[in-house]
A protein has these predicted regions:
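Cys-dependent protein tyrosine phosphatase-like superfamily
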Residues: 1-134, 146-240
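Ser/Thr-glycine-rich phosphate-binding loops at phosphate-binding pockets of nucleotides
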Residues: 139, 143-144
Length: 240
């Protein structure tokens, strides 16, 4: 079995989501769908490694100010299709990022307030048919985690497996916390550490809430305009 974790200099939380079984006996293809944090610090050798891995499309979910602060290393690369598809803009972030009690509440806010953007992102994933695709945000946990969860749901991966995949982020982001810790004011360290946590129950609660509100994840996807045709395209491209 291929290694799920791809360890490259200058990037955190880079993982292949291949290998997961679906409820109908298929599996997510390896080397088709990757997830990660931001790419601005990739070394030249790491950029070449991703090229050699076959990467041809990048979907960057970050906001405009994030792009200014940390430009994407592949934004102008030849042979790479770069799509900046933010889940919300700098203004909308004030509503989406308003204080919440739990991570699940944050994700449900995304589910409710970012429907046009989620539709665009999932439609773009469905269009990539023949080479690895990388979805990323800042640390590859929240925005990326939700997009990957909805994609895996569309493919027929069971909720508990989706929650397990989401939960892997914390172990991959702990080195980021260790690296940044000296520069973080002591009074903000607990908040930063909480930001990189990825408890599996947060994704379990999110998927359960979608089921409660919409009847099923499939119904929610239909609300987004991700109907049978796009689902079949996703399955054809990403399953074996």
């Amino acid at each position: 079995m291929p290694d799920r974790t791809l360890s490259l200099e200058g990037i955190y939380n880079l993982r292949d989501v291949g290998g997961y079984p679906t409820t109908d006996g298929q599996h997510v293809r390896w080397r088709r769908l990757l997830r990660s944090g931001r790419l601005h610090a990739l070394s030249p050798s790491s950029q070449q490694a991703l090229h050699d891995h076959g990467l041809r499309t990048i979907i960057d979910l970050r906001r405009p100010f994030e792009l200014t602060l940390h430009p994407n290393a592949f934004a102008a690369s030849e042979g790479i299709t770069y799509l900046n598809l933010p889940l919300f803009d700098d203004i909308g972030a004030e509503t989406v990022d308003a204080p919440a009690q739990t991570l699940a509440e944050v994700y449900i806010r995304y589910i409710e307030l970012c429907q046009p953007q989620l539709s665009t992102v999932l439609s773009a994933i469905a269009e990539v048919s023949d080479a690895p695709l990388l979805v990323h945000c800042a640390v590859g946990k929240d925005r990326t985690g939700l997009v990957i969860a909805l994609t895996l749901s569309a493919l027929g991966v069971a909720p508990h497996i989706i929650a397990d995949d989401y939960a892997l982020s914390y172990a991959h982001l702990a080195p980021l916390f260790d690296a940044e810790r000296p520069s973080i004011p002591p009074e903000r360290r607990d908040r930063f550490e909480r930001m990189i946590r990825s408890p599996r129950e947060a994704m379990e609660q999110t998927l359960a809430s979608i089921n409660q509100r919409y009847g099923s994840v499939a119904n929610y996807l239909e609300t987004l305009g991700i109907g049978a045709t796009k689902i079949e395209r996703l399955r054809a491209n990403l399953l074996e």
